[in-house]
């Protein structure tokens, strides 16, 4: 994920305080220099870096740590609070009737972002509509229409009309029944006069409740001037940062937020319409520092389970705690997990599993794990209902047949069966447990004992 390098660097800096109970001035000087290097490497504006590091230094030297608090935890708390202050509050987006205007350069991800936002509002119970006004870029209409079809939201565009202002007006009329209108505009490769003039005309025509600037996370220092120009022409109330699943540095986008005196509204975390997060500053910085984000995790779990149950109304996840745990249950679990997004993003949300633990894993650990899950899914697709319901009937001849049918090998089939057996044993231990017992079991699983999340990452035979 974007800013991963920044997170790794910050965590590495803080680890140097491990074992210290008190901080000397030289300790603070060294940690502040490390933080400055980390932020500058991530393309955060120099003035912001100095402001942030000065605040951290002052607080670290002047504030007395609470009793029993280590130097590392004390500085971690200060860094967390100051970085939350740096990124600011989330953009206010009431769940009510509104018109949102999107601005940004070509390639920033506006069209994809429009469909993602519409999908997000639809999941909140509103009826959104996307109005595509980009007459400059070939294929913009087709892309927007396809993305909105995937998001299952209303769409308006007119490929035969070359007047973006007229399209915007007609779009508002044609989608009058919608609660939320998201107006996508054309971009250019640079901040050209005709781009600014066009978006100012559209802004006057649609009279948006708020205008959002869409920024590619890789933009770097160029974000500052871009943000300033759009702020001057239409006023920017919030920012959507796109392509956060890439390896970009991301600091430029944070600089743009500060430059426009606005805030971050959404994060784009992948290529599908579901890969969007409402920005929550505390959770975002918490993940960056390896502290997890349980709120975002619970939202993803809830959404994934609901979608899985929509497709299979007979399945209730709670049934696994009541009776047998079959391969069908395991397959449904894996499907729900896939719906939660890339595995590395999910792991970052789990306290104790992201951050430092992820830093210790090989770079390809997530890819290897997801590849293994895909092979397991192919194997289960090659099984009969009887085999999925009663894995113990799978003997040597069936193993050979399943391996051939799935394009895998017999060893991988046996690994799947072993994995199922391990998970079955773990789940059976939950049956009849009270809440306190379950919490202790989850902690044990997280440490890599008994087929839990720790094992998933290579702590043992582990799931997947």
Swiss-Prot record:
SUPFAM superfamilies in alphabetical order: Domain of the SRP/SRP receptor G-proteins (SSF47364), P-loop containing nucleoside triphosphate hydrolases (SSF52540), Signal peptide-binding domain (SSF47446)
Pfam families assigned to the protein according to its UniProt record, in alphabetical order: SRP54 (PF00448), SRP54_N (PF02881), SRP_SPB (PF02978)
Gene Ontology CC, one term: signal recognition particle
Subcellular localization, as worded in the UniProt entry: Cytoplasm
Chain ranges passing through the membrane: none
Record-annotated disulphide pairs: none
Enzyme Commission number: 3.6.5.4
Catalysed reactions, semicolon-separated: GTP + H2O = GDP + phosphate + H(+)
Signal peptide: none
GO terms of molecular function: 7S RNA binding; ATP hydrolysis activity; GTP binding; GTPase activity
Binding residue positions for GTP: 104-111, 184-188, 242-245
Top enzyme category: hydrolase
GO BP terms in the entry: SRP-dependent cotranslational protein targeting to membrane
Keywords per UniProt: Cytoplasm, GTP-binding, Hydrolase, Nucleotide-binding, Ribonucleoprotein, RNA-binding, Signal recognition particle
Assembly: Part of the signal recognition particle protein translocation system, which is composed of SRP and FtsY. Archaeal SRP consists of a 7S RNA molecule of 300 nucleotides and two protein subunits: SRP54 and SRP19.
Function statement: Involved in targeting and insertion of nascent membrane proteins into the cytoplasmic membrane. Binds to the hydrophobic signal sequence of the ribosome-nascent chain (RNC) as it emerges from the ribosomes. The SRP-RNC complex is then targeted to the cytoplasmic membrane where it interacts with the SRP receptor FtsY.
Family matches, as HAMAP family: SRP54 (MF_00306)
Record remark: domains: Composed of three domains: the N-terminal N domain, which is responsible for interactions with the ribosome, the central G domain, which binds GTP, and the C-terminal M domain, which binds the RNA and the signal sequence of the RNC.
Assigned protein family: Belongs to the GTP-binding SRP family. SRP54 subfamily.
Name of this protein: Signal recognition particle 54 kDa protein
Species this chain originates from: Halorubrum lacusprofundi (strain ATCC 49239 / DSM 5036 / JCM 8891 / ACAM 34)
Gene that produces this protein: srp54
